[in-house]
A protein has these predicted regions:
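A short beta-strand segment in extracellular, disulfide-stabilized domains
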Residues: 56, 62-73
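C-terminal motif of bacterial Sec signal peptides marking the signal peptidase cleavage site
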Residues: 15-18
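Exposed beta-strand face motif in extracellular beta-rich ectodomains
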Residues: 110-117, 422-423
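Mature soluble binding/inhibitory domains
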Residues: 20-33, 136-453
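C-terminal edge beta-strand
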Residues: 129-137
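Extracellular/luminal low-complexity segments enriched in Ser/Thr/Pro
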Residues: 71, 95-110
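Low-complexity "stalk/linker" and mucin-like segments enriched in Ser/Thr/Pro/Ala/Gly
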Residues: 43-59, 78-98
Length: 453
């Protein structure tokens, strides 16, 4: 590990000796002896979260992830630190000088680890002092997720519940980090702090379920650098890497985006042949694969992509029409996802999400956000969709719309408010709910993702 060195000025200690002159046969007086100085030692005091700490019987200090540790030496010092296992401990908000070593401790693992802070006196390298900490296991929720965002990007979200902090890293490696906090008004929801949030109400939030995270974040507006808007995302740490496991029939919603324009897409798709083929029904009326006329079925080949869990698709009738998909696991259920740039002109940014088709429609209540920047509670029963959505300005929009049959061949696809002006489609699987605006109406391009508690 790299030492942190700091300059120091050595103190020079002098002693004066006296001499006497004899006269008349008198004797001379001897000089005073040089004083013997005690050997210097390097000592430290330790504080944890601002309070004095006492070492255990074995000379080590017990701390938990998220604690702020301060080590203060009695001599100006240079510093080094290490963890065992290597890399298991990271530091946040480090403040290191010749007179102090301070940082918040994060355990990057779900097991206990050891962390050592080593001081070496700047003026005398022979003087050293190790301060050893037993660091408790990190929170089991300290995980990283592959994120598929509705602005058409793929990112990585790392959450640390010990330090209540996050890092969101985009495809270029640009990382933004800050803190998050529990939402006191909605158990199980957490609020992202971000300098990108400028609205009166912060609707950048997330919720967790087994292997997955669903939320909203101030991502860059698609293809508009420097502009940000709160938009939904879904992330998973369980991505299907076995090709045959991709197989399934999915109801798939999507949006296409470029500056000033946004469109919706609603399709049923089927991955078949042990994950080697993707079938898509291109009928104007939304139609199941089973009921789709053969001339309206587009077939794509599927092969392994550039990274584990990414699968490349190529239209067998048009090699320039290609893309990528992934299947992620959310609480044990398969979810089809895609985010990126369309290879076909005009090269829209695209987002796709698909749930496994089912003959069952469930009564559910979810929490989630939409690409209007709202966050709220979303309810479905046999006949009605309801939502209480908090807008960025803090006002609440309450809606209650009737559900409609959207496709005779796809029972799990529902229409919302087909008798009204703002018309939507909905799907759900008991864990996720997704709503998309219908094409050619005022809410075209709308997308909402909710997670059932």
């Amino acid at each position: 590990m790299k030492w942190f060195y700091f300059s120091a000025t050595a103190a020079l200690v002098g002693a004066l000796g006296g001499c006497g002159g004899g006269g008349g046969g008198g004797g001379g007086g001897g000089g005073l002896p040089f004083p013997i100085l005690p050997a210097a030692t390097l000592g430290v005091t330790v504080q944890v979260n601002g309070s004095s700490a006492t070492a255990n019987g074995d000379g080590k200090y017990s701390i938990k992830p998220g604690d702020v540790v301060t080590v203060t030496p009695n001599l100006g010092s240079d510093w080094n630190s290490s963890s065992d296992p290597a890399g298991s401990v990271s530091l946040r908000n480090a403040d290191i000088s010749s007179t102090k070593w301070s940082a918040q401790i994060a355990n990057n693992t779900n097991a206990a680890s050891m962390f050592t802070v080593s001081a070496k006196a700047t003026a005398n390298a022979a003087l050293t002092k190790d301060t050893v900490f037993n660091v408790a296991a990190g929170d089991a929720r300290n995980l990283s997720y592959k994120v598929y965002a509705t602005n058409g990007s793929q990112q990585t979200l790392a959450l640390n519940f010990d330090t209540m902090s996050y890092v969101m890293t985009d495809e270029t490696g640009l990382a933004v980090s800050d803190s998050f906090s529990a939402d006191a008004a909605q158990t199980g929801t957490y609020v992202f702090k971000s300098s990108r949030n400028t609205a009166a109400t912060n609707n950048s939030r997330f919720r967790l379920i087994t292997d997955a995270v669903v939320g909203s974040f101030p991502f860059q507006v698609a293809q508009v650098p420097g502009s940000y808007a709160v938009q939904p995302f879904i992330g998973s740490r369980a991505i299907v890497t076995t090709q045959s496991a991709l197989d399934g029939i999915y109801i798939r919603f999507g949006i296409n985006m470029r500056p000033g324009l946004i469109d919706s897409q609603i399709r049923q798709v089927q991955v078949t042949g042990g994950g080697t083929s993707l079938l898509l029904c291109n009928e104007v009326a939304i139609t199941s694969i089973a009921a789709c006329p053969p001339t309206s079925i587009a077939t794509y080949s599927i092969s392994a992509g550039s990274s584990a869990g990414s699968w490349s698709t190529v239209n067998v009738a048009n090699a320039s029409d290609k893309g990528a998909l992934a299947v992620i696991m959310v609480d044990g259920k398969k979810v089809y996802v895609a985010a990126g740039i369309n290879s076909v002109a005009p090269n829209d940014s695209i987002f796709r999400i698909g749930l496994v088709d089912s003959s069952t429609w469930l009564n559910t209540t979810a929490r989630g956000g939409d690409n209007n920047g709202t966050w709220g509670t979303l309810g479905f029963d046999a006949t009605t969709y309801t939502a209480a959505l908090t807008k960025p300005d803090g006002t609440v929009s309450n809606v209650s719309y009737g559900l409609n049959v959207a496709s005779a061949s796809i029972p799990a696809l529902k229409g919302i408010n087909f008798a009204g002006t703002d018309r939507y489609f909905a799907m759900q699987d008991g864990t996720l709910s997704v709503v998309v605006g219908a094409r050619t109406n005022p809410v075209t391009g709308y997308l909402q993702i909710g997670l059932v508690p």
